[in-house]
């Protein structure tokens, strides 16, 4: 099939998630080409999925309906962004900040498929969680993932923009995490077709400079966070200084950056002052 195009790592991924063929199964076939392995779908069906990926730039995750992320296998669709590996670090940052003392209340703003919310629910089963999204379809997807992967944990779903649906909880949110849209609109055309043509632009594009959503989100952050509460944001690879400046201008303190897996500053955090008067 690789003669038709595509990357071997993507074909291996499809065989694994779509066909139930593990990496070790593939290695055994390389050693013994006459060997047999069981597959969950017919080769014809897998070939159809591969051609859709090659010819229509369909994301493999959409074709099989799932995406592995951290220790989870999440249901995904075109209703929300496919969770990226680097976003796993947002969860790591939140967990490290909490240490051995889970927050009483946390929130995931722009939850999408619910990847972050599910992870935080599983890490902090006794905490009160909130997941917010502007898209009703994304919230429906998040609800499915929360029900399947964190059925015993408490997480309320809220439909609306950023902090607004959480006004009843302002001043109580101790840890808040968000992966907002941050791609500058002039760069949209440069994105890979698999992203540009099949993932929701409302969750990708952050205006002309990519900071529109982040500015909006920061307006109410000092009011909505609990005293000493922290906000973690993911941003574009070249926005670190700008996002930190915006956090300070909004009144947050202890502002700092954190790097992604490649050593690039892709995350920012800031706190509401313990004794802030707003």
Residue ranges, per PLM feature:
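Conserved AdoMet
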Residues: 15-96
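Flexible, glycine-/basic-rich loop-and-beta segments that form/coincide
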Residues: 274-278
């Amino acid at each position: 099939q690789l003669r038709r195009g595509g990357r071997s790592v993507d074909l291996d991924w499809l065989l694994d998630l779509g066909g139930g063929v593990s990496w070790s199964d593939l290695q055994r076939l390389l050693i013994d080409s006459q060997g047999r392995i069981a597959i969950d779908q017919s080769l014809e069906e897998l070939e159809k999925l591969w051609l859709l990926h090659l010819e229509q730039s369909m994301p493999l995750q959409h074709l099989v309906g799932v995406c592995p992320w951290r220790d989870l296998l999440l249901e995904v669709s075109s209703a929300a962004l496919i969770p990226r590996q680097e976003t796993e670090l947002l969860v790591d940052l939140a967990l490290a900040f909490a240490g051995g003392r889970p927050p009483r209340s946390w929130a995931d703003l722009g939850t999408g498929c619910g990847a972050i919310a599910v992870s935080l629910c599983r890490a902090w089963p006794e905490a009160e969680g909130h997941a917010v999204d502007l898209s009703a379809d994304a919230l429906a997807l998040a609800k499915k993932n929360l029900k399947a992967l964190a059925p015993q944990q408490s997480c309320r779903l809220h439909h609306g923009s950023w902090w607004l649906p959480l006004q009843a909880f302002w001043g109580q949110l101790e840890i808040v995490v968000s992966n907002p849209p941050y791609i500058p609109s002039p760069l949209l055309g440069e994105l890979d077709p698999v992203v540009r043509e099949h993932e929701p632009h409302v969750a990708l594009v952050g205006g002309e400079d990519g900071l529109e959503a982040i500015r909006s989100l920061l307006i109410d952050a000092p009011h909505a966070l609990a005293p000493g509460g922290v906000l973690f944001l993911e941003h574009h690879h070249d926005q670190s200084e700008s996002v930190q400046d915006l956090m300070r201008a909004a009144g947050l303190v202890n502002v700092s950056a954190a790097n992604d897996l490649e050593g690039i500053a892709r995350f920012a955090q800031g706190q509401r002052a313990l004794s802030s008067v707003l």
